[in-house]
């Protein structure tokens, strides 16, 4: 895929600029998976999501093994509108690598940021707000308790951010290879299209289509599919698949785990990551927490916006 296809991708999806709103009484965390849900945290909500990861990688071609420690973080804040969220997300990783080439193994260490991204997400289509306002169908039990075709229509958001990569970073691709900028710090764009379906029975399905670092010599194209199930009000489990395509790194990753909602503003979680290749093979365990400071005061509804909303207020 090249820059022309990337531009076409953005042009195809940007026109869907509808209005909606979202706020939940309970914490709305992206953890413990890697995907971004379509919904923002809500206006005047400040949320922190962070975790620790411990894992091992083994690369058969390079004949080395890596013991890794990772710290990931996300700071999210709902500002101006219910649909709008600004965030700082990133991950710092420290590797202890043992190389088995030659007659005697030797060990070395490397550490840096795998990512450090400042961005904005906007929820531009939310079919669930209309469903909530309409209320249940008082004439049909079946309509309220069985699958409906409209359940396939997801909420949709768009994220645009900037990656801030440090110089001489072994964990990120060089911005422009074979030039004086090869080992310099760089800023590159990241775009994410997110969809979210909230289905009956406590199932939530999230998809992400990601275009990352397209101005560098190693652009990354990926997708994430996340299925979450909440059997109770306080406990959830998830499975996730992530596909990554890049000259720097390509893989198929699989995650699974659980989260426990301690109270409406605090969540703890744990997850496992693995893949099925040997260049490298990866196995990671992660634990994390999410906490929000809820300063939200009032919801903005679709009916409150535009000409009809102003007319209703005058009446």
Show the residue positions of the predicted features:
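Bacterial Sec-dependent N-terminal signal peptides
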Residues: 1-27
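Transmembrane beta-barrel domains of Gram-negative outer membranes and organellar outer membranes
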Residues: 22-214, 218-315
């Amino acid at each position: 895929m090249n820059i022309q296809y990337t531009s076409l991708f953005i042009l195809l999806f940007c026109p869907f600029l509808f209005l909606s709103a979202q706020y939940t009484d309970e914490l709305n965390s992206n953890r413990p998976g890697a995907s971004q849900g379509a919904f923002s945290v809500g206006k005047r909500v400040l949320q922190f999501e962070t975790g620790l990861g411990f894992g091992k990688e083994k690369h058969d071609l390079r004949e080395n093994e890596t013991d890794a420690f990772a710290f990931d973080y996300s700071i999210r804040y709902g500002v101006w509108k219910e649909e709008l969220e600004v965030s700082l997300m990133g991950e710092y990783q420290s590797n202890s690598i043992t190389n088995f080439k030659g007659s005697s193994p030797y060990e070395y260490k490397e550490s840096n940021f795998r990512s450090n991204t400042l961005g904005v997400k906007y929820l531009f289509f939310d079919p669930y707000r209309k469903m909530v306002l309409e209320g249940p169908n008082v004439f049909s039990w079946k309509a309220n308790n069985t699958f409906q075709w409209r359940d396939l229509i997801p909420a949709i958001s768009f994220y645009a951010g900037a990656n801030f990569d440090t110089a001489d970073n072994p964990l990120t691709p060089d911005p422009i290879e074979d030039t004086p900028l090869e080992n310099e710090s760089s800023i590159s764009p990241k775009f994410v299209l997110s969809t979210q379906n909230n289905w009956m029975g406590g199932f939530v399905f999230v998809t992400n289509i990601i275009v990352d670092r397209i101005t560098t010599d190693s652009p990354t194209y990926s997708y994430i599919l996340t299925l979450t199930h909440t059997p109770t009000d306080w406990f959830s489990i998830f499975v996730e698949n992530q596909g990554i395509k890049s000259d720097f790194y390509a893989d198929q990753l699989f995650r699974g785990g659980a989260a426990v909602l301690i109270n409406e503003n605090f969540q703890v979680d744990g997850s496992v990551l693995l893949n099925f290749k040997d260049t490298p093979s990866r196995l990671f365990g992660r634990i994390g927490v999410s906490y929000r400071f809820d300063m939200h005061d009032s919801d903005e509804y679709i009916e409150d916006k535009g000409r009809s909303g102003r007319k209703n207020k005058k009446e």
